């Protein structure tokens, strides 16, 4: 159908348009060309002589503007005639066809990747559209060409970045030229391009709808009267597919819902339109049953809108779903005769509503627990994709209070329906919502939990109350967490995972609030460390977070050894981000599939739940320093104890720091700890304290001044131990008061530390209570030769064991595998095996060696050294 067959257009406007579109010469030349073409067709085709001549006469009679203003009867008669009818074309129509041909040429250039021709054709396209713009409308073909060309250009540029392939000079110049031209053109027509990309089919169909002629033309006056009548009409109706008007009445609600449910999951389903329909259905709903059914369906439809490329629910849709869910709970709370349970049978009769007996209840299939869980998950996904350092994250996080209110109301509703045994509602549903409530409070400080819970009860209707956490009975956050956890311990029969997660949440809460010994005892008595590998990934992440929090709690309590031991498994691995679900680690050698990467990102925790990794590293390195530096001094000449390593990560960092030729002032946390370690090893405990105190990260802890005071005391004590280990061989006696003045400790504290070292056989000395001095025993330290001899003996022993294992493997454990000639028996032979050289299992050994390398090793070497002494 020609694009110029428009209805409701006056002859005046048509004549004005014609004067602008084509000249008199075109009008005069067009008709002879048509006649000549008809004569040629008459000579070639003898069968259609009459029809051709008649059509030629008809075409010659109608010229000018009247040729384009045909009524329906003319168009019908022409369509029923011969298909060879020629239509006189205006200049505008010709230019439009030229525009389409140029756009087609650009598409052909895209297929062969010929950017030179694409650039030339795009210039031609811009010149052609400039003439068509005189009518005031932008051709949609032009908008489509710009959008498609821009997409193709971006795709080409992306491929060039991934797999660089050198273009020839012509293509390269053409691509650069098109890039500049497209940038300018898209900027001028950005609004139209966005409309085209939003819905391409609808955008292009709108043009076709504009050019289609109506079947009946009305005079301009009658059309104006119709518009006025439409303006006066106060009613409205929704037009569905095929132009049918949808009538929304209370009686038709169930039928409309049935139609929407049947179309769920199908392709080409407009969910936005379905939501609008259901919003109108809710307005006309007359009974609680209808409202409940509509709300259940509309919430499910909103959740379906997040499928596809979108990874999380938009804030607008989430707020709408949250509001509708709150409305659903309000309807269920006021209409107690209707309940929503998972085990209910659906109502199949759409013609009538169900009747509820007096005092009875009617069950509607659904799950309010699943809805509130989905709201929680969607909020978490949204927080995962928002930059946490922006105001948008804070604004989005404020929605958590509304979600918490709905979780509590859902818990109250599940408590109510769980009391009715006839509904057969499983206990698991109530446990799920209680667990959700616990997961929203366990990681928060007590003050925040108290405010959150108080505001929640203010939003809950006064007539509602809970049997698990009655209104006003929970005085503080600790009581709330204990009540929720104890309920899950009792009512999770057969749900080991839920019980384990509840225990981890309680341990985390206790550790967060500095109850170290209770958190430690619960962790040890639960034996979760033995079975955690069989749990799901989310539970393993929670276990890692709890373990880290227990370690931080031990550090705040001044228990350095316990803190380092607890944090060793997480911090020593170098994968803190991955283990705590606070970031995706870049795998250098392992190939990660897109699905694995997507799942890893889905497990990430929102930023407000993160544990500060810099603080965690600082605590771990500080504890390692306080343990490793005295150990370095103790193992100066003992190769046996040197094998003991507390933290490989710390030692690797310290060795790297010592290899540096020039060491500047500390810039980060790690540099501060390394330089403090170096100062502590040299006995400069005051300088080490200054380095540790200058770390800014301590300010993030609850009581930073107490933490710094505790660290000062620990550094003083470990500095004293390091000094005694290092300089003990050079003293005969040492006054306690001198040590007290050197390390700014009381005499009693120094005496206690020295006594502990002597009792643990770390120091070969005696404490004289009368003179308040330390008397060192001489001759117990190994010389350099003795240390090398012991090292050689250890290596020889290891070589013998390796040879024996190799021989046993080859001989498959036969009886004569270890027989040797010349009396050189095995471990019990003349040479005593490993025991003969060092007083081991097969030889004669002296008194057992003491820990710390302060006594002899026994055997021949020990006897020789002892005789000299």
From Swiss-Prot:
PROSITE patterns: PCI
Keyword hit for Cytoplasm: yes
Domain of life from the UniProt record: Eukaryota
Region Disordered: start-end pairs: 1-92, 182-242, 803-869
Location within or outside the cell: Cytoplasm
Assembly and interaction partners: Component of the eukaryotic translation initiation factor 3 (eIF-3) complex.
Family as reported in the entry's similarity comment: Belongs to the eIF-3 subunit C family.
Stated name of the protein: Eukaryotic translation initiation factor 3 subunit C
Organism phylogeny: Eukaryota, Fungi, Dikarya, Ascomycota, Pezizomycotina
